[in-house]
Amino acid sequence: MGDVEKGKRIFIQKCSQCHTVEKGGKHKTGPNLHGLFGRKTGQAAGFTYTEANKNKGIIWGEDTLMEYLENPKKYIPGTKMIFVGIKKKGEREDLIAYLKKATNE
């Protein structure tokens, strides 16, 4: 997969204004992402999701995140995530490598 350190920089630049990753981290505009891998969409405790997110029914993993992060609104029509996505595959790979580590510590 990608480079964890590059992924951390991408997370700080593009994701951290709306998300946290640490265990017990607070929800912001978007949910805390701790425990993301292996969890179904729309399941972070204490966060209010759209019906689209709750009903998507996929399990978050490398493949689903690769597709979602390229174009969130295309992958889950009706999501309230306003982020336009990351077009460069290498950047998505780096971000996923970071998320895999950071959301599991």
From Swiss-Prot:
Electron transport among keywords: yes
InterPro entries associated with the record: Cyt_c-like_dom (IPR009056), Cyt_c-like_dom_sf (IPR036909), Cyt_c_1A/1B (IPR002327)
Keywords: Acetylation, Apoptosis, Electron transport, Heme, Iron, Metal-binding, Mitochondrion, Phosphoprotein, Respiratory chain, Transport
Post-translational changes noted in the entry: Binds 1 heme c group covalently per subunit.
N-acetylglycine found at: G2
Function text: Electron carrier protein. The oxidized form of the cytochrome c heme group can accept an electron from the heme group of the cytochrome c1 subunit of cytochrome reductase. Cytochrome c then transfers this electron to the cytochrome oxidase complex, the final protein carrier in the mitochondrial electron-transport chain.
Gene Ontology MF term list: electron transfer activity; heme binding; metal ion binding
Family named by the database record: Belongs to the cytochrome c family.
Location in or out of the cell: Mitochondrion intermembrane space
PANTHER family linked to this entry: CYTOCHROME C
Signal peptide: none
N6-acetyllysine: residues carrying this PTM: K73, K100
Residues found modified as N6-succinyllysine: K56, K73
An example Gene Ontology biological process: apoptotic process
A GO cellular component entry from the record: mitochondrial intermembrane space
Residues that hold heme c according to the record: C15, C18, H19, M81
One Pfam match: Cytochrom_C
Listed name of the protein: Cytochrome c
